[in-house]
């Protein structure tokens, strides 16, 4: 922990603390980061590398949580913090055993534990033994204070690597740093702010002819996400069939099968029973199993309501951005659109999109003999994602393929939204008007003198550019150029003389 503290003092800065207070301040900050991660990131049973692991969280969600926490508490003042630097903070926490990556091997060798900002990378919090207890007693999950205490007392931890990391982060300390110890806001208020600002940011990126759909979305009461998803299958008489399918998937080192079995959780019991009872007698015929699973998943999603059936006007806006080659803006707009999904639909869509991306891989199981896997997946699942009558088939296909190609990124939360939400939450928390420092500024009020000066300067600059364009246009004949220059001199002689001289 000593390395973490020095790291924090040097680059993130807590100059408001005296020398005697520095250990307390640094301990508080790091404990706060760890506590926020432990309490806000979603921990549940997940699949990773064809195996199922308990109590895991997603790398991209960890970045989202810490990113929001750092900005909201203004540990670094108003400086912009890139998402990449938050990823490196997560790497530092992983290096110090706050959490660990799910063990993976690449070609039989242990993979270097590098933190990944991805919805496909999973991590779990570490445990440390109670030093006062005897051998054999159960380990407990570290509380933030236990982490700080254990890391401070550890003589094995070297601070050099962390100090180098903090130096490379290049974050200057705030002039008036402030450790926020005020009461936290309720989850309901936080979710309402997230929804309001998400919609506001979406309006900035996408041109909408009508605001009805967004206003209806804003009127809906946001649901507070549950920490763990309660399964309704436990008491089902068909739970055994689901268990058999999961056991089969776990026994096969096949990413395709793993992604497909994950999707079965959302299929009705009757379909799952049919799949289980229709399994081929030869267990090694994975081609028949994949054909069975793909057909069942395709049939189910072709007969249910599309997962992105909300905000149809936004679909058109995103598709238009893609047509115009504005991929980065389209990606952020898509991230905002998916942020408006409730947790259950968001998780279901994430699993389906992951399965689609895996199944569309040309090196995977051939879905149809004379068709490309990518086109088959698009055709089967397009209506399961978007069924918008106002969206042409070409734009629908473009949108679906874009989602498949960027399935690892579309569920991340944009950094711009993080900052805007954090500023507003901080204002609410401190009792200020949350709309005073709004994140979306469409115009700025200026006095008449500044307006007049700006108008004259802008007009003059544009006229000079026009004159320069006429003078340097090689496509104009000498006669045409002389005529245009004469007209310009007649209307704006002062600018003409300024450019050409007397």
Curated annotation (Swiss-Prot):
Pfam family, one: DEP
Xref: CDD domains: DEP_DEPDC4, RhoGAP_BRCC3-like
Biological-process GO terms, alphabetical: intracellular signal transduction
Record InterPro entries: DEP_dom, WH-like_DNA-bd_sf, WH_DNA-bd_sf
Domain DEP, chain residue ranges per copy: 37-127
Annotated family: Belongs to the DEPDC7 family.
Full protein name: DEP domain-containing protein 7
Source species of the chain: Macaca fascicularis (Crab-eating macaque)
Gene name of this polypeptide: DEPDC7
């Amino acid at each position: 922990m000593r390395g973490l503290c020095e790291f924090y003092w040097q680059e993130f800065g807590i100059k408001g603390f005296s020398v005697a207070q520095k250990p307390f301040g640094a301990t508080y900050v790091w404990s706060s980061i760890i506590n926020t991660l432990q309490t806000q990131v979603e921990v549940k049973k997940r699949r990773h590398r064809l195996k199922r692991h308990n109590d895991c969280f997603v790398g991209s969600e960890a970045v989202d949580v810490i990113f929001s926490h750092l900005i909201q508490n203004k540990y670094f003042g108003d400086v912009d913090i890139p998402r990449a630097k938050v990823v490196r903070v997560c790497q530092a926490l992983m290096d110090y055993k706050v959490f660990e990556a799910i063990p993976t091997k690449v070609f039989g060798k242990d993979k270097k534990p590098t933190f990944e900002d991805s919805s496909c990378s999973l991590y779990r919090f570490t445990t440390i033994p109670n030093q006062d207890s005897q051998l054999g007693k159960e380990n407990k999950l570290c509380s933030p204070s236990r982490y700080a205490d254990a890391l401070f007392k550890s003589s094995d931890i070297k601070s050099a690597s962390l100090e180098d990391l903090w130096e490379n982060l290049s974050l200057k300390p705030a002039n008036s740093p402030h450790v926020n110890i005020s009461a936290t806001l309720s989850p309901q208020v936080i979710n309402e702010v997230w929804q309001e600002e998400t919609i506001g940011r979406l309006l900035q990126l996408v041109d909408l002819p009508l605001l009805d759909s967004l206003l209806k979305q804003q009127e809906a009461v946001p649901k507070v996400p549950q920490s763990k998803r309660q399964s309704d299958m436990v008491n089902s008489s068909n739970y055994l069939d689901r268990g058999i399918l999961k056991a089969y998937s776990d026994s096969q080192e096949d990413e395709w099968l793993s992604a497909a079995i994950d999707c079965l959780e959302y299929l009705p019991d009757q379909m799952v029973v049919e799949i289980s009872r229709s399994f081929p007698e030869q267990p090694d015929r994975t081609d028949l199993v994949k054909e069975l699973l793909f057909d069942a998943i395709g049939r189910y999603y072709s007969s249910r309501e599309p997962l992105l059936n909300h905000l149809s006007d936004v679909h058109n806006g995103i598709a238009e951005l893609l047509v115009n080659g504005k991929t980065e803006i389209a990606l952020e707009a898509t991230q905002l659109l998916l942020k408006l999904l409730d947790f259950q639909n968001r998780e279901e869509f994430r699993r389906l999109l992951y399965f689609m991306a895996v199944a569309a891989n040309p090196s995977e199981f051939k879905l149809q003999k004379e068709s490309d896997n990518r086109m088959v997946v698009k055709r089967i699942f397009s209506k399961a994602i978007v069924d918008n009558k106002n969206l042409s088939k070409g734009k629908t296909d473009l949108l679906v393929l874009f989602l498949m190609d960027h399935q690892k990124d579309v569920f991340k939360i944009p950094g711009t939204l993080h900052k805007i939400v954090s500023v507003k939450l901080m204002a609410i928390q401190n009792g200020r008007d949350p709309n005073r420092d709004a994140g979306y500024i469409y115009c700025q009020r200026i006095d008449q003198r500044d307006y007049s000066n700006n108008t004259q300067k802008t007009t003059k600059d544009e006229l000079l550019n026009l004159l320069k364009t006429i003078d340097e246009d090689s496509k104009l004949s000498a006669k045409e150029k002389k005529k245009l220059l004469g007209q310009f001199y007649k209307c704006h002689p002062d600018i003409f003389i300024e450019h050409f001289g007397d």
